[in-house]
Amino acid sequence: MLHFQSLLKSLMVVGISLLSGVPFESIALGSARPAQTPLVTVADLDVGESATLKLHDGTQATVKLLDLKETRDDIRNAVRQAVVTVEVNGKSVSLVSCTYRLPVTFANVQIDCPITKGYLQKSNKENAWGLTKDARLRLWPAGSPWMEPGTFVYPAKQCWFATDTQMANVPTFVDGGEVPANKNIYYHYGLDFGGAEGMVDVVAATDGLVVSSGLEKLPGYDDSPVAPRYDVIYILDERGWFYRYSHLYKIEDFVKPGQRVKMGQKIGVLGKEGGSGGWSHLHFDISCRQPSGLWGIQSGYAFIWEAYQREHHPEIIAVARPHHVAWAGDAVELDATRSWSREGAIEKFEWTFCDGTSATGPRVRRTYDKPGEYNEIVKVTDASGDIDYDFAVVQVIDKNHPDQVPPTIHAAYYPTFDLKPGDEITFKVRSFRTREGSEVWDFGDGSPKVTVQSDGNAKVHDPNGYAVTTHRYKTPGRYIATVRRSNERGHEAITHLQIVVSHR
């Protein structure tokens, strides 16, 4: 281990590192022999600092961090957007850090900015990224995959954006965590995939060695990101990267420390155990040595996007995330520009709002006068007529009564793939920040509404905390199911799900 650490330190020059991998045995035994080299090259820079990097194909790129601007809200003083201006091979480009952004191609490289220093301040997760400078940049050659093909798969057996998600640098919100009085922000650093508790299979994203499973841990990994917990698995791959799978409803019996797993092999079931906040989801993150020499997060959004594309070949993906938080009466800009089509440009953006009005365009501005959790629908259409939907979450709080926060709501369904007319679909819902009222479902097919009642997150880990119902769609189509619940002040939380039913 000491030899491994000294090698890493020798590679750190002005905070720059090609994050080379090592075989499983090296972490425990001290071997420095590379096994699988990541395709990404990483640089941590202060404003005004530059570096020349060698990319994985042998080419070089010179980068300089010119500027960093971080925008904070006036509700929690949380960073809502960070923009770096970077000079790449003599040309300047601005990049938004994470929050559902993908690498961009510019000046013969692909580049992104996964983290900036503002996300580490007043954060309750300390320095999960291992960043000691102003910002981190990641580079790949133009046209390169982001992850070596055949070495990484999507870790949850459900469709893309099946329900709520919390990706990197987004303050956690699904379980009602966006409270004005709470200035200690949990900027999410991993990837949260919401799903139906106890139903969605979780698979190993890579081949790897199980280092910990539940409370059991292999010896020799004290200097590592591994932190055993009853609902957590850590797997080490041949890049020397650690993969964490958290909040599992069940861990498969064979998943024991020292066991090797294959990419795509089922290792557990999605749940809400551990520090889930009470909403059912898979927390997935990747950690590796960073240019600082510290263990830190390797941002995974681009990797899961690429993996899902390879496995499922979607023609179009609507993206209206991340969520928004605003005072009542303030304007909010809804943004679907991160939507994607295999055809190229999106031709139409059509918005349908909770108040029954509508608008068109990739960005729209809205003002909300009443507190609540809104869930605005965007439909995107490309030149081939392919369509997809996503939903923009807007949490609105009364500035005169900031302690009277509105309810929030999480819904999920299963299965999400290969649905046919007549198939039974399970729908689950749980509300947060209220125990008044009931949830009311409208399945979007003209059938009668269904009323259920969750526990309002009274007991976080209650196996019956989600209210459960089932529904069958009679005909093929693309349906938008809606569920809502109000609190004692009449403030409502609304969410939507997109369900695609195909011909038999």
Region annotations inferred by a language model:
Residues 213-216, 266, 272, 379, ...:
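Short, surface-exposed secondary-structure boundary micro-motifs
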Residues 66, 209-211, 249, 271, ...:
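Conserved positions in beta-strands of structured domains
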Residues 299-504:
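Extracellular/lumenal mature domains of secreted and surface-exposed proteins
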Residues 1-7:
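N-terminal secretory signal peptides that target proteins for export/translocation
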Residues 196-204, 236-264:
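Short histidine-centered loop motifs in beta-beta connectors
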Residues 136-231, 263, 272, 276, ...:
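Surface-exposed, glycine-biased beta-strand/turn segments
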Residues 27-161:
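Surface-exposed, beta-sheet-biased, low-hydrophobicity segments with strongly acidic/polar composition
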Residues 10-23:
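Bacterial N-terminal signal peptides
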